[in-house]
Amino acid sequence: MDNHLAQGDPKTPDAMTNYARLADLPVTKCRDAAALAAQSFDAVVDALYGTGFHGSLRPAGLAACALMNRQRESGAFVLAVDLPSGINTDTGEAAEGAVRADLTVTFDSCKPLHTAPSSAPFCGEIVCADIGIRDEWHPAGLAQL
């Protein structure tokens, strides 16, 4: 199995720590977008942006999302981690070029974007994974799948 990392270097401390862990995994860092775009994949994992995303996609993010969407159009299965990149978690507003996933695996509970009419179609099937957060720690009115 080939794994490719298609976004630039991480900027936050947590992202830097996890990025360093890649040294022990079979991951190819691809800085040549044209070379990556020329390949076809059976599956794509979208973990580009997280719950803090808002506004428009930056040029590199827009290009990465476009690549994932083209791969999906060519038959690749797209799995989004927590949410498809390019969607505001709280409002469901989808930026131009947001990823369209076949499956979105979210953690603990459904977020507003998973049910908002503007963004739910981008999620595909939604699976909520239990990660052990106790019920009493949930805010009132939190949606559960």
Regions found by a protein language model. Give the residues of each.
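A cross-family phosphate/adenosyl-ligand binding-site feature
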Residues: 1-44, 49, 54-59
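YjeF_N-associated NAD(P)HX repair module
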Residues: 41-145
